[in-house]
Amino acid sequence: MPAITLPDGSVKAFDHPVTTREIAESIGRKLAKDAIVGRVDGELIDLDRPIEHDAYVEIVTSNDPDGLEVIRHSTAHLMAQAVKQLHPEMQVTIGPTVDNGFYYDFAGERSLSEDELETIEQRMSELAEADHPVEREVWDREAARQFFLEQGETYKAQIIDDLPESETITVYRQGDFADLCRGPHVPSTGKLKAFKLTKVAGAYWRGDQNNEMLQRVYGTAWPDRKQLKAYLDRLAEAERRDHRRLGRTQDLFHVQEESPGMVFWHPRGWRLYLEVQDYIRRLMRDNGYQEIHTPMLVDRSLWERSGHWAMFAENMFVTESESRDYAVKPMNCPCHVEVFKQGLKSYRDLPLRLAEFGSCHRNEPSGTLHGLMRVRGFVQDDAHIFCTENQIQEEVRTFIDLVYRAYRDFGFEDVLIALSTRPDERVGDDALWDKAESALATALETHGLDYTLQPGEGAFYGPKIEFSLRDCLERVWQLGTIQVDFSMPGRLGAQFVDDDGERRTPVMLHRAILGSLERFIGILIEHYGGALPTWLAPVQAVVLNITDRQADYARSVEQQLLESGFRAEADLRNEKIGYKIREHTLQKVPYMLVLGDRELESGTVAVRHRDGTDLGSMELEELVARLSNDIAGHEREQED
């Protein structure tokens, strides 16, 4: 009979196969009430599943991330049950959890709209109120397949067909609804108290655009209504900060159907883009990088030799000319190797740092495109460092300094780091991997940086460090990376002459600080809610006349600001001054300069900040000093 070891080290002996529910009840009524599932020797199981052997058992509640995951998975089933009751003709397919929630894909001719989400939620609430037991059943494979076919659930039958023969077929039943699932699930629908359906989208069956289009309903679920409300408030704030909306209201950029996944930059947006690019360019120039530029269209033979054609061809845009196949480059690395190969290099030339604002294109599925965050055409702040094995650690250490400096200057303080090590399938011997992994880890530890180890997550050609940012909404964005590459230089024939006159293959370090400039600008816009720091703002000051009498003076003020090096505009439209102020406040222009007859006569400007602060009347020289000081504060931080 099982002896159950608990997290506090105590052991409970039972004279019969015991369930996690019984174990929880033996500890206390509150724990039994709060229990969601059990964790038995590290495996999550349903509360009523018998444990027949000695085991280490933890009672998982909604306070445990695994408990919350189960709640969300079970809520996906609850939603599927509600949809089936409302629309019996629709088929259910799959319903996994995702970050902060879940989705379920439905098939059928009927279109689900966001207007129906409230009706579905109401039915879900009724089903939760009914507190149906959720029961796990083990089925014979063929019986399960036949059951779902008889129910008209052909997708479920297809899933069963694709499962390994060794797989145990389990069905979860709640009320009149049965679903194919591995589980585990909450013990009853009454455990599902706080949920919200958020949107409807399209999705291809199994993510393959050659398959039929399904309807995906997203939702979120939390242990209680307080946590749900907090999340929905964050969601609403994220909507207010959505870079696509701010891109329109601030006249920064747009995308359109004729060029999906490509960005049309407007004058203001392009100024922001160039400011970000110029910052990185200065950083590279001051730290020993040489900027290059390589072709956008490259013959497939180079991609075949680099290995990208075999691994990445489906994501390349390919064209043909004069019986030759060309690919629009999806990345810059092979071209950088070709630049390195021009002229034999000595060990004295290493490390050689080649940087490029490389324009890349990838044929991403149309359903994944999302404003600036997921595009088909983008520019990377890409660079490749060619070095010896002994130089890896120092180059990584220096790069980490650059990463932290850049993120700090752009206003990000919370940086998360992950170190990904050797996968099972890889090139290079273990000694080389040992050296590279040790170099990356030592560089991080020398900086006193905490990092998450991701065993087996490195590329086949080398380990890597990934840098992610946490923004003001607690969202995490993966941006920077530095990756050791033992493979590509050798594949493409890159060599240098070492100190004993022998030809050697250099190690190549792939590195980027921001990654895609488009994506980083999207993150910047959302992090600041469009109110970018003055040094980044596309328009730093706008001059607003009250009547036509001040128009010439407004043009003069604008011109003086431009000549002083500021990004300024004059708004001379025949509109009420209150309307102009509101409009430019919405556009998050840092300073608004209001000119009336009093300012015209005195040669001053009335200054308002975008936060609503009235800064009073200023001489133009005083305003220039204030703007300069605002921007200089950022520059002083860069120098620290």
From Swiss-Prot:
Its main location: cytoplasm. The keyword Cytoplasm applies. Its cofactor is Zn(2+). InterPro entries: aa-tRNA-synt_IIb, aa-tRNA-synth_II, aa-tRNA-synth_II/BPL/LPL, Anticodon-bd, Anticodon-bd_dom_sf, Beta-grasp_dom_sf, TGS, TGS-like. GO terms for molecular function: ATP binding; metal ion binding; threonine-tRNA ligase activity; tRNA binding. It is found in: Cytoplasm. GO terms for cellular component: cytosol. Its EC number is 6.1.1.3. Zn(2+) binds at C333, H384, H510. Pfam families: HGTP_anticodon (PF03129), TGS (PF02824), tRNA-synt_2b (PF00587), tRNA_SAD (PF07973). It is an enzyme of class 6 (ligase). GO terms for biological process: threonyl-tRNA aminoacylation. Residues 242-533 are annotated as: Catalytic. Keywords: Aminoacyl-tRNA synthetase, ATP-binding, Cytoplasm, Ligase, Metal-binding, Nucleotide-binding, Protein biosynthesis, RNA-binding, tRNA-binding, Zinc. It catalyses: tRNA(Thr) + L-threonine + ATP = L-threonyl-tRNA(Thr) + AMP + diphosphate + H(+). Binds 1 zinc ion per subunit. Residues 1-61 form the TGS domain. CDD domains: TGS_ThrRS, ThrRS_anticodon, ThrRS_core. Catalyzes the attachment of threonine to tRNA(Thr) in a two-step reaction: L-threonine is first activated by ATP to form Thr-AMP and then transferred to the acceptor end of tRNA(Thr). Also edits incorrectly charged L-seryl-tRNA(Thr). Belongs to the class-II aminoacyl-tRNA synthetase family. Homodimer. This is Threonine--tRNA ligase. It comes from Halorhodospira halophila (strain DSM 244 / SL1) (Ectothiorhodospira halophila (strain DSM 244 / SL1)). The gene is thrS.
